[in-house]
Amino acid sequence: MKTKQEKKARPGSIMRLLWSSHPWLTFFTLLTGLISGVASIAVVNVINQAIHEETFQRQSLFWFVGLSVVALLFRNGASLFPAYASMRIMTRLRIALCRKILGTPLEEVDRRGAPNVLTLLTSDIPQLNATLLIMPTILVESAVFLFGIAYLAYLSWVVFAITISLMILGVAMYLLFFMGGMKFTHKVRDEFTAFNEYTHALVFGLKELKLNGIRRRWFSRSAIQESSVRVAKYNYIERLWFTAAENVGQLTLSLLVGCLLFAAPMFAVIDAKTMSASVLAVLYIMGPLVMLVSAMPMLAQGRIACTRLADFGFSINEPHPEPETSDADNVLLLDHKKSWGSIQLKNVHMNYKDPQSSSGFALGPIDLTIHSGELVYIVGGNGCGKSTLAKVFCGLYIPQEGQLLLDGAAVTDDSRGDYRDLFSAVFSDFHLFNRLIGPDEKEHPSTDQAQTYLSTLGLEDKVKIEGLGYSTTTALSYGQQKRLALVCAYLEDRPIYLLDEWAADQDPPFKRFFYEELLPDLKRRGKTILIITHDDQYFQLADRIIKLADGCIVSDVKCAVEGKRA
């Protein structure tokens, strides 16, 4: 079952993005570009008139200075003013893309892999920004070029015909080389995504790399070095194609000037004044033409960025409104959190593909009901589906078949966000945020309460509360980071706690404290607790033990009360 987020969006148009976001500023850019174009060509005409004047004319000097100033001011205005608009547009798109990622189903993000998603933010958005910044310049130079062509037509149709013919030939040759370079533009982007994956491994696998020389040498040579060489090679070949394409422009200019000087007189009688004006105009408009030609790779890269973003379901031309929240909805949600009775998985199936390999995993059919206040252990061998089941249960993974029910009502796309708010979780691949988050967005947890939890979990000497954050989240052992993650979960104070092999990295005394003191305390406070664990010596403390094998529940056992009290 495909979700809404998985649908591919239309790539969109960068020019339409600029117009829809700031129509008046875009119109102003076009208008000033036209004025700059007219003034620039008028300067060429004044120069030509001055060349053929027999005596110095003060009026020509005034026209030359005045028109040059007008052309310069309007060209700069048309280029600089939209930079502010571009900045605002890109800020909005960055925020919207982050919200899009937050709203994308977790299984879709996992399927794509973190490096691919990060490349959207670190490569595609900056590339789109660079393209957007060059758009005003393209508009201005296009205006200058078009007025230059019109001026040539005004001077002589023969000159105009020769110019257009050679330019069409030059553009055709340019596109031939340009398309060759575009093949490598795609390769550069794909290889950069792979390089992002290696840099991620470099940072987070540094300990393993330092400990093993064979792995370190393999990683340095076969991974980082080879990927870097491929990025450089594809960049170089791409640059060769694009440079060859740009050189076509210089060749076209030389041919064009030669044809005007030596071939045009064969077809028509052209006086010296018209010929000099034509050559001056051609030389003048070649600057904008070369700039437009040079901008094509940037435009192409921006188009690729739009396509990659659209593949993720993010179109730059679609509205991206801020999420709306209602105080009344929050009150109803909080009331419901206090009174929920059961959560049911009904004939749930979930097919999951490992993003790191081609292997897949199937969960289901799963039929399971969890009641409020239960302490449930989820057990089974590695790879049996415990973590996948947990993510389905808390609403992070959307079942491809079957239903997730809260008090008999199906959890839908509209209610899934509220449903997830029932949970505080510490997964095996958890991430610590340096911010105190309480149960209510309007009320921050007290620092005294946070300090009490730090003391309870033996972190009072390692972590201090500073403002609304922690003094550190990184200068801790992995086991201590897990304890701090549990402190965060305590402060959230949600009805359901989901802990994925939390005790696996704790020392025996603290592991015992966790099972015999912390979990019973949470249960006494009315919390529902789901524990993924391998610690069979504490199984007797659970209300229920659910065992999984090959993605299916093979047993669901209720533990005797007497056994737990013994």
Curated annotation (Swiss-Prot):
GO terms for biological process: antibiotic biosynthetic process; peptide transport. GO terms for molecular function: ABC-type transporter activity; ATP binding; ATP hydrolysis activity; ATPase-coupled lipid transmembrane transporter activity; peptide transmembrane transporter activity. The keyword Transferase does not apply. Keywords: Antibiotic biosynthesis, ATP-binding, Cell inner membrane, Cell membrane, Membrane, Nucleotide-binding, Transmembrane, Transmembrane helix. InterPro entries: AAA+_ATPase (IPR003593), ABC1_TM_dom (IPR011527), ABC1_TM_sf (IPR036640), ABC_transporter-like_ATP-bd (IPR003439), ABC_transporter-like_CS (IPR017871), Cyc_pep_transpt_SyrD/YojI (IPR005898), P-loop_NTPase (IPR027417), Type_1_exporter (IPR039421). It is found in: Cell inner membrane. GO terms for cellular component: plasma membrane. Residues 22-301 form the ABC transmembrane type-1 domain. CDD domains: ABCC_MRP_Like. ATP-driven efflux pump necessary for the secretion of syringomycin. May specifically bind syringomycin and translocate it to the periplasmic space. SyrD is also required for full expression of the syrB gene. Belongs to the ABC transporter superfamily. This is ATP-binding protein SyrD. It comes from Pseudomonas syringae pv. syringae.
